[in-house]
């Protein structure tokens, strides 16, 4: 897109999103932070699985700390979207209940979703 290759187009797009109430600064902070912190969390797991690091109290504490950082960015996303964390979880539960009749995971339904199932 033009906004991805031209600074003025990007600037115009950011203004447009701001005028629509997108709270783009907080959304971008949240999106970048969730991915960065998720990567740090996964890095610890990767080292335990593939590089012989132990599942030790220190590594567990490190994961908890990274998870806390990740949760802070999730909170930023919730604030940007003006939705509570509890509402996000409730919506996810409702989505999964609709996707998996009977409440049990099924590979078929995970790969063959109904129309509108995000």
Question: What do the PLM-derived regions correspond to, one by one?
Answer:
Residues 1-118:
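Flexible "arm" and connector segments at domain edges
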């Amino acid at each position: 897109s033009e906004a991805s290759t031209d600074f003025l187009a990007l600037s115009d797009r950011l203004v447009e999103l701001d005028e629509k109430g997108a709270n783009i600064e907080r959304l971008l902070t949240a999106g970048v932070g969730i991915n960065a912190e998720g990567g740090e969390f996964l890095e610890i797991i990767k080292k335990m699985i593939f590089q012989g690091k132990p599942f030790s109290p220190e590594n567990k504490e490190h994961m908890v700390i990274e998870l806390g950082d990740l949760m802070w960015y999730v909170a930023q996303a919730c604030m940007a979207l003006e939705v509570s964390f509890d509402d996000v979880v409730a919506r996810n539960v409702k989505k999964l209940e609709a996707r998996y009749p009977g409440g049990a995971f099924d590979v078929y339904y995970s790969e063959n979703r109904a129309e509108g199932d995000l």
